[in-house]
Structures are given as structure tokens and as C-alpha cells.
Amino acid sequence: MDAIKKKMLAMKMEKEVATDKAEQTEQSLRDLEAAKNTIEEDLSTLQKKYSNLENDFDNAKENLTVANTNLEASEKRVNECESEIQGLNRRIQLLEEDLERSEERLTSAQSKLEDASKAADESERGRKVLENRSQGDEERIDLLEKQLEEAKWIAEDADRKFDEAARKLAITEVDLERAEARLEAAEAKIVELEEELKVVGNNMKSLEISEQEASQREDSYEETIRDLTHRLKEAENRAAEAERTVSKLQKEVDRLEDELLAEKERYKSISDELDQTFAELAGY
């Protein structure tokens, strides 16, 4: 029982650790979402800059016909920027899809962790019920043993009374042979002894029936104890299975953390590329 309690305590501690790591993973996802929003704002700023660049280009075309060559070069550069922006938008879209899949896997892991926690709690409740029932059965067996001892004592006392009655009957028969005058008193005594014998006989029969019933109840209790022992073993097996499930979930959470770390690195790379692009656009 102590081993099961220790396992259940360890499993609860592992569940709490897994929950903390899951919360940290959710926080990382929120941070990634904030970074994505920042990138979107930067892209919006870039689009505004591009719009301003087009306006400047139109004004330059109207006012400076001499700068056609430079203007064509600027248009080429704008087209290149548009291509780069489209590529970045595509990469951002793919990154958002990766984030959605990561969130789905995290949700699945949390669901499995909740199921494992419920299974562990159910195993703990089953174990306590089994302990209470086992204790109740032990108390009933002790009571049954006491009743059996009392029945044996009553049977022995009945035997002694029977022997005493037989002895008295023998004495009465001797007295009857020796004294006819005391016949009436002896007959009354015999009737009394016969009544005692009947009572003793009935008590003996009752004791035999009680002893048989006690034996049957004891067999029933033994069968109940065997059944409880089997159910306890099943509860231990379920607890072990729940522990293995928690271990698997821990591995899944670790894997998700590694994936999130990789996503953060990808975000950093994209951010660096955007900064470089903004610097190049600012130069124009």
C-alpha cells in the first residue's frame, strides 16, 4: 500500500511539473504571436513606404523627364522589393500554419495529461475504497472467530451439563432400586432431567447449525478477500499504466518545447531579414 501511495504522489508531482511546462509553452506561443503582430505592423509600414515611393516616382516622372534612366532603375528595385515582400508574406503564412499545428499538438497533450490525472485520481479513490472494505472484512472475521469460540464454549458447557445429567440419572436409577418409597420424587426428578436433556439436545442442534453457518460465512469472507486482493492488483496495474502515460506526455511536452525553440529561431531569422530589407529600402 505504501508503495502505491508513493507512486501516486510521484505521479501527481510529475503531473504538476508537466502542467507548469505546458503553461510555459503557452506563454512562448503568445510571445511568438506578439512577434508575428510586430512583423505584420512592420510590413504595413513597408507597404506605406512603398506607396509613398510610388507617389514620389509619379511626381518625379512629371517634373523630371531627364531622370528616366534613374527612374527605371528605381522601378526595377521596387519590383524586387515587391518580390521580397511576397516571399516574406509567404514565409509568414507558413510560420502561422506551423504555429497552429503546434497549438493543436499542445492542446492534445494537455487533454491527454488531464485524462491521465483523472485516471490517477480514480485509482487513488479505488485504492481507498478497497482499504476500507478490507478493514471491514477483517473486523467481521474477528467477530466471527469470537462467535465461533463462544459457540465452542457453549457446546463444551452443554457436554458438561449432559454428563452431569447422565450422572444424576444414574444416581436416580440406583436410588430408585434402593428406595421404592421415593419413587414419586425420583420420577419427578427424572422428568426434570429429561427436560434438561431435551433443552441440551436442542441447544446442541442450534450450535451445530450456527457452526455450519459460521463456516459458510467464513468461506464467503475468504472469497471476498480474494476478490478484493485481485481488484487491488488491478488498481496497482492501472496506476502503473497511468504513470507510463504521464511519462509519455512529458516526452511530448519536451518535444513541443524543442519545436517552439526552433520556431523562435526562425522568427529571429525572419526579423533579421526584415530589418535588413527595411535598411535597404530606407537607403532608397
UniProtKB/Swiss-Prot annotation:
Keyword field contains Coiled coil: yes
InterPro entries linked: Tropomyosin
Gene3D superfamilies from the UniProt entry: 1.20.5.170, 1.20.5.340
Stored Pfam families: Tropomyosin
Tissues where this protein is expressed: Expressed in mantle muscle (at protein level).
Uses: The reaction of this protein with ribose in the Maillard reaction may be useful in development of processed seafood with low allergenicity.
Region (Disordered): 103-136
Keywords associated with the record: Allergen, Coiled coil, Muscle protein, Repeat
The keyword Repeat is assigned to this record: yes
GO BP, one annotated term: regulation of muscle contraction
Modification after translation: The N-terminus is blocked.
Molecular-function annotations in GO: protein homodimerization activity
Quaternary structure and partners: Homodimer.
Function of the protein: Tropomyosin, in association with the troponin complex, plays a central role in the calcium dependent regulation of muscle contraction.
Family membership noted in the UniProt record: Belongs to the tropomyosin family.
Domain notes: The molecule is in a coiled coil structure that is formed by 2 polypeptide chains. The sequence exhibits a prominent seven-residues periodicity.
Protein name per the record: Tropomyosin Tod p 1.0102
